[in-house]
Amino acid sequence: QMCIRDRNRAVDSTFNCISVDGEMSTNDTVLGLSNGLLGNKKINDKSPQANKIYKSIENIFYGLSKDIVLDGEGSTKICKIIVKGEKNSRDSKRIARNIANSLLFKTALFGSDPNWGRIISAVGSTQIKYIDQNSIDIYIGDKLVVKNGLGLKLSKKINQIMRKKEIKIIIDLKKGKYESFMLTNDIGHEYI
């Protein structure tokens, strides 16, 4: 039972946090197999190594999730979108997924365009009522590009970050303690 629960938790925090083109694959499967032939002592929730095993499974799944995104048709970049400061985990996931699935955002990634307006647009299109655009901060890499809903002057460093193969974007809503992430890629000529 623990193995099934840990597999499901790890799938939810890795494979279910990726978007290549916003479509669900009909043939993706994750299996966990154990035959018990080694005769090792059974591990349960109270076992000292239980959390270590879960973290190992999650790390393997995260690496495989990244590979799926990087292998997406025509993908040239991978982007980790982190939405933090949300009132609940459901809405933070919803916002992160909406940004990750946005074609406007994905094409901006492809063009190395630090167009934070496309990020704000994807946040707003979730229609979550309590989001206050005037309190949103956005970081591209470690550089603040939007403070309290207002765009800042973009430095040349932002353009360098946008040309990297791996990019991190943080959206801080400053409304609560919940945080979620999505891994996504750009969409360019080869995808079309």
Task: Cite the ranges covered by each PLM segment.
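Glycine-rich, flexible beta-strand/loop modules in the N-terminal catalytic cores of phosphate-handling
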Residues: 19, 24-46, 179-192
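Flexible, glycine/charged-enriched surface loops at secondary-structure junctions
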Residues: 15-27, 63-80, 106-116, 130-135, ...
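A glycine- and small/hydrophobic-rich beta-loop-beta segment
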Residues: 32, 36-110
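Long, well-ordered core segments of solenoidal/helical folds
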Residues: 8-13, 99
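Glycine-rich, charged/polar anion/phosphate-binding loops
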Residues: 11-20, 63-69, 121-124, 152-157, ...
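Short, small-residue-biased leader/transition segments that mark boundaries at the very start
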Residues: 2-4
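Internal helix-turn-beta structural module
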Residues: 93-97, 101-192
